[in-house]
Amino acid sequence: MTGTIPSNSQDPDLVLSARPSAHGRFGRFGGQYVPETLIPALTELEQAAATAWKDESFTKELTQLLKTYVGRETPLYEATRLTKHYERGTVGPRIWLKREDLNHTGAHKINNALGQALLAIRMGKKRIIAETGAGQHGVATATVCARFGLECIIYMGQEDMRRQSLNVFRMKLLGAKVRPVTAGTATLKDATSEAIRDWVTNVETTHYILGSVAGPHPYPMLVRDFHAVIGEEAKKQCLEAFGRSPDVLLACVGGGSNAMGLFHPFIEDRSVRMIGVEAAGDGVHTGRHAATITEGRIGVLHGAMSLLLQDSNGQVQEAHSISAGLDYPGVGPEHSYLKEIGRAEYAAVTDQEALSALQLLSEKEGIIPALETAHALAFLEKLCPTLSSGKEIVINCSGRGDKDVNTVAEKLKTKN
């Protein structure tokens, strides 16, 4: 969709394009705000992706690896006991989980990491860098680099390394070099900044596997397209399970890749509500949160114009969340666009609400979700009472919670 759509358009007949404008924009969001040294690399990446998607050998190899290496397709699971929990008498929606936690490496992240690794090989780039917050993208990137024999360097904030020590060990075990970032808040924003600095310095030999639908064009489109397999599978599985599209899609949003992967194939179906759930941290009113769409203003971060958490001087504010994967002060530009035109809805839940949701799913379904996923699950408390029987909710279970067990144990110990 080009930038011809007016700001805050609520046109119900709006048809959304699969591609941003020629300048990499979704409405007024997106673009390429990067040093000139990176423009050739971004152009090369966009052209390589466009060529690859038209190449049957590329799509065949990607599809085969997604099946035999990643373990796709992932199930659409009917959460019967969770559904029962939210019933009012016998009234309430039915809840389904799209089980991305069952992918190799335990999250959705490998869909994108695998696709970009194949592109890097096509471009002749043998050195790979990536940023990571919760560690899942770092593990996924280290995994595909091991699979293809590529050099791998992961940038991770020191605070996130403390919170996600298990994933740090996994990355090292897979042969990656994990470089701690101590600048700023020592979290995802700072790790991303360091990765971009590395890329500027080594652009001729290095490909940056960016882990979310953020950053300069073509990354928001590229990452979304590699994750769209989530929604494509879900659409087919919903038809098989209950004969139609779901009424509501629900996914957590930090940068927003798992949500865009689920949402994208449904965007033109106006009968489907799409709800992204951000991290309210200690509460939006406290200032200690990562609710970018809920509270942010337009600005530029990491190469793209989008909604950002900013102070009165336009400086990027620190984000806070119990979830390292949502602890980011920006969001992908397509999410900002979907919010502005009224196609998607966004809400925020607190750390405590996410913890409670993690415990609930664990006890009701025997599935321990990632803290990121738990934010989407927590919104069921507000959503389910508004829906009648016969409504179908699909939640993207974006990752498993093994990595978060220590954090959860500490919080519950403190609480008790």
UniProtKB/Swiss-Prot annotation:
Gene it is expressed from: trpB
Gene3D superfamilies: 3.40.50.1100
Task performed by this protein: The beta subunit is responsible for the synthesis of L-tryptophan from indole and L-serine.
SUPFAM superfamilies membership: Tryptophan synthase beta subunit-like PLP-dependent enzymes (SSF53686)
Family, similarity comment: Belongs to the TrpB family.
Catalytic activity field: (1S,2R)-1-C-(indol-3-yl)glycerol 3-phosphate + L-serine = D-glyceraldehyde 3-phosphate + L-tryptophan + H2O
The keyword Endoplasmic reticulum is assigned to this record: no
Cofactor(s) recorded in Swiss-Prot or TrEMBL: pyridoxal 5'-phosphate
Protein's pathway: Amino-acid biosynthesis; L-tryptophan biosynthesis; L-tryptophan from chorismate: step 5/5
Organism expressing this protein natively: Prochlorococcus marinus (strain SARG / CCMP1375 / SS120)
GO cellular component: cytoplasm
Entry's Gene Ontology molecular function annotations: tryptophan synthase activity
Name recorded for this polypeptide: Tryptophan synthase beta chain
PROSITE patterns: TRP_SYNTHASE_BETA (PS00168)
EC number: 4.2.1.20
